[in-house]
Swiss-Prot record:
Keywords from the UniProt entry: Cell inner membrane, Cell membrane, Cell shape, Cell wall biogenesis/degradation, Glycosyltransferase, Membrane, Peptidoglycan synthesis, Transferase, Transmembrane, Transmembrane helix
GO biological process, one term: peptidoglycan biosynthetic process
InterPro entries named in the record: Glyco_trans_51 (IPR001264), Lysozyme-like_dom_sf (IPR023346), PBP_transglycosylase (IPR036950), Pep_trsgly (IPR011812)
Main localization of the protein described in the UniProt heading: membrane
One Pfam family of this chain: Transgly
Record EC number: 2.4.99.28
Catalytic activity: [GlcNAc-(1->4)-Mur2Ac(oyl-L-Ala-gamma-D-Glu-L-Lys-D-Ala-D-Ala)](n)-di-trans,octa-cis-undecaprenyl diphosphate + beta-D-GlcNAc-(1->4)-Mur2Ac(oyl-L-Ala-gamma-D-Glu-L-Lys-D-Ala-D-Ala)-di-trans,octa-cis-undecaprenyl diphosphate = [GlcNAc-(1->4)-Mur2Ac(oyl-L-Ala-gamma-D-Glu-L-Lys-D-Ala-D-Ala)](n+1)-di-trans,octa-cis-undecaprenyl diphosphate + di-trans,octa-cis-undecaprenyl diphosphate + H(+)
UniProt xrefs under HAMAP family: PGT_MtgA (MF_00766)
Annotated protein name in UniProt: Biosynthetic peptidoglycan transglycosylase
Family of this protein: Belongs to the glycosyltransferase 51 family.
């Protein structure tokens, strides 16, 4: 009787398993680095050149086009020196009082916002700095996801590393929304007061800064008691606001 050899199941060698796991991880890492470099290159470019649009501007324009295909945004870039210092102080006073001190993240504001959210049991306050808001406006969608928040954090770090505080504030004032289809402080000053951004008085600046939180609503509710009260508070804080 002839004995036959029974074949034993082969087990993958440890080195082969490591290779199988390592390759997809390296590929994912390469894709992530390539994706981040896209943001980095844009930000380095904007050290010298002005952004002509933003992700948020494009999103708003698409929304407007669904209602009116001929709709256009009001937007005109204006250099830092041509923006009223009153307006700069007003925006910092209301949006990011420690703008000149932090490196992109105001941990005190985040703590206050977190406690407020816990008290109200909802996401009512965010504690985002001007740099964080700029990261969202320039590159990101309005989705509220963990991935988007992580991406916002990375972009904020890049902004703070490669742009000066002065440049961050200049771009911010030129790209944020100030009303229905109104983007940038020059368009806002002309839309609401019929004057250039360089001529904004303290009272006008405080009022404009107070509408940043909900610009489209306040575009049609300009005499809202809540808005006017907020503007008076901002006006009282102008002398202590520090600008680049």
């Amino acid at each position: 009787m002839k004995l036959t050899k029974t074949s034993r199941p082969t087990t993958p060698q440890p080195g082969l398993i490591s290779t199988w796991l390592l390759r997809p991880l390296l590929l994912l890492l390469a894709i992530a680095l390539l994706y981040q470099s896209w943001f980095l290159l844009h930000i380095i470019y904007w050290r010298t050149y002005h952004p002509t649009t933003s992700a948020f501007m494009q999103d708003r324009l698409e929304t407007m086009h669904r209602q009116n295909p001929a709709a256009k945004l009001q937007h005109r870039w204006v250099d830092y020196e041509q923006i009223s210092n009153h307006l700069k102080r007003a925006v910092i006073a209301t949006e990011d009082a420690r703008f000149m001190q932090h490196q992109g993240f105001d941990y005190k504001a985040i703590e206050v916002a977190w406690k407020k959210n816990l008290k109200q049991r909802k996401l009512a306050a965010g504690g985002s700095t001007i740099s964080q808001q700029l990261a969202k406006n320039l590159f990101l969608s309005s989705e509220k996801t963990v991935w988007r928040k992580l991406q916002e954090t990375l972009i904020t770090l890049i902004l703070e590393e490669f742009l000066s505080k002065r440049r961050i504030l200049e771009i911010y004032l030129n790209v944020i929304e100030w009303g229905e289809g109104v983007f940038g402080i020059e368009a806002a000053a002309r839309h609401y007061f019929g004057i250039p951004a360089s001529s904004l008085a303290p009272e006008q600046s405080a009022w404009l800064a107070s509408i940043i939180s909900n610009p489209r609503f306040y575009d049609t509710h300009r005499q809202s008691p809540r808005l006017l009260k907020k503007a008076r508070i901002i006006l009282s804080r102008l002398p202590t606001a520090k600008i680049p």
